[in-house]
From Swiss-Prot:
Residues 1-69, 101-162, 214-267, 421-458 are annotated as: Disordered. Induction: Induced under aerobic conditions and repressed under anaerobic conditions. This is Transcriptional activator/repressor MOT3. Residues 37-65 have a biased composition (Polar residues). The gene is MOT3. One of its GO terms (molecular function) is DNA-binding transcription factor activity, RNA polymerase II-specific.
Length: 490
């Protein structure tokens, strides 16, 4: 009886354990469904207006300078991040100020500190209004001259459609308000990817912000449309962001004057659904002084390319200091170009190294990636950069490379090498005797065949020495190596 009772207890315990596991799995599945609800609603662009990118296919051939960065351009979308990470978003944003309507400059400045990205052109043309603003943004611009009807929600820095959606707890509209579509190539730095978190939590954060500060939201809305109107403090963000930069706040209407603003600058961020979205950084409210006018305007300062500021010219004691040029309202993110003797202008934001050329910086940025995309065809090891793989193949697999060169009918001109003759006297003497015994044909055979060591392996010197000695042609070696890399890295 005791044994039967014990067996029954064990069976009951196993059944209870299985039921608990089944319940946990159901809870996890429900939680995941809830987390993705907002993303799925946003991906349905039928409810939020036309999306010029919705019909564009994924493009997996475009290679970012850093595979851990997220690249999206107007004609392609990529998925460099694993699917299980696509439920995350980046928390910080900037407002893209593009105010062509002078009557709405104050409203633009009020929203310039908003942590949400919008692309509101503030004109009658709806083509420049992003999916995040769709209809409400255009409707709000018609009421900018009416102080009582302006719903820009300055105290919370939340756009009208976001404020309405949050007040009504409309998750579909609220989620749509947080999504904006990119217009330029701007990769997200890898160092900012640790600050991703769930969009549902993000929107809930602004629900709380609206509910706690909904009294007097429109009390100070657009009191006067003048250049002295200052932007309110941005809405509180997560406390774990540690990137603090020294910024300047540029008011578009005060003649280009720059005011000091000690608020931390947060990088633009992306929101992910089944694809990654890249948002533009605001060039106007946050003026970055480390910008090179030579670089294209669509490249965001402080992201990939940091340029070193121009050193101030030294002045004589009897002469007043040279005036600092004021910023241009049209191109407020430009500063004078570095002097001609300042060669290293492209600076890496991760390790502070500087480079003469932008292409060199892009190649260097791959070294900061954790991904290794270049496969060695011989040992199957992986390298972060192509030049590292080329170096690896030449140094670690010299014999394999020599064999591959022979297969491609590459001529080895050992007769032109002095050091190779000194290092391999016996082999070269044998080759010379065979060449003299058979005339010109023997000489050609000796030039086309690599001498072997006693163990039967190929020529034991490295490829660089062979190229320097004139045994191998540098272009032939490069061509064979590139063909190997391409064939094994498709």
């Amino acid at each position: 009886m005791n044994a039967d009772h014990h067996l029954q207890q064990q069976q009951q315990q196993r059944q209870q354990h299985q039921q608990q596991q089944h319940q946990q799995q159901q809870h996890q599945h429900q939680h995941q469904q809830q987390q993705h609800t907002i993303l799925q609603n946003v991906s349905n662009t039928n409810n939020i207006g036309s999306d010029s990118l919705a019909s564009q296919p994924f493009n997996t051939t475009t290679v970012s300078s850093n595979k851990d960065d997220v690249m999206v351009n107007s004609g392609a979308r990529e998925l460099p991040m694993p699917l299980h990470q696509q439920q995350y978003i980046y928390p910080y944003y900037q407002y893209t100020s593009n105010n062509s309507n002078n009557n709405n400059v104050t409203a633009g400045n009020n929203m310039s500190a908003s942590p949400i990205v919008h692309n509101n052109s503030n004109n009658s043309n709806n083509s420049n209004i992003s999916a995040s603003d769709y209809t409400v943004a255009n409707n709000s611009t018609s009421n900018n001259n009416n102080n009582n009807n302006n719903n820009n929600n300055n105290n919370n820095n939340i756009h009208p459609n976001q404020f309405t959606a949050a007040a009504n707890m409309n998750s579909n509209a609220a989620a749509a308000a947080y999504y904006s579509f990119p217009t330029a190539n701007m990769p997200i730095p890898q160092q900012d990817q640790q600050y991703m978190f769930n969009p549902a939590s993000y929107i809930s954060h602004y629900y709380s912000a609206v509910n706690s500060n909904n009294n007097g939201n429109n009390a100070a809305n657009n009191g006067s449309n003048n250049s002295s109107h200052s932007a309110p403090a941005p809405a509180p963000g997560p406390p774990h962001h540690h990137h603090h930069h020294s910024n300047t706040h540029n008011n578009l209407n005060n003649g280009g004057a720059v005011n000091t603003n000690n608020a931390p600058q947060h990088h633009p961020t992306i929101i992910t659904d089944q694809f990654q979205f890249q948002l533009q950084q605001n060039p106007s409210p946050n003026l970055n002084l480390n910008i090179n006018p030579a670089q294209p305007l669509h490249l965001p300062p402080g992201w990939k390319i940091n340029t070193m500021p121009q050193p101030r010219p030294t002045t004589a004691p009897n002469h007043p200091p040279a005036p600092v040029p004021s910023s241009n309202p049209v191109a407020s993110n430009l500063v004078p170009a570095p002097s001609s003797d300042h060669k290293y202008i492209h600076q890496c934001q991760f390790c502070e190294k500087s480079f003469k050329r932008k292409s060199w910086l892009k190649r260097h940025l791959l070294s900061h990636s954790q991904q290794r995309h270049f496969l060695c065809p011989w040992c199957l090891s992986r390298q972060k950069r192509k030049d590292n793989l080329l170096q690896h193949m030449k140094l670690k697999h010299t014999n394999y490379l020599l064999d591959e060169l022979k297969k491609n009918n590459i001529i080895f001109n050992y007769n032109n090498s002095s050091s190779s003759n000194n290092n391999n006297d016996n082999n070269n003497n044998n080759n010379s005797n065979s060449a003299s015994g058979s005339g010109g044909a023997g000489a050609a055979a000796a030039a086309a065949t690599a001498p072997e060591n006693e163990d039967g392996n190929g020529y034991d010197t490295n490829i660089k020495t062979l190229i320097n000695d004139g045994v191998l042609n540098k272009d032939d070696v490069k061509r064979v190596l590139n063909n190997l890399i391409v064939s094994h890295n498709k």
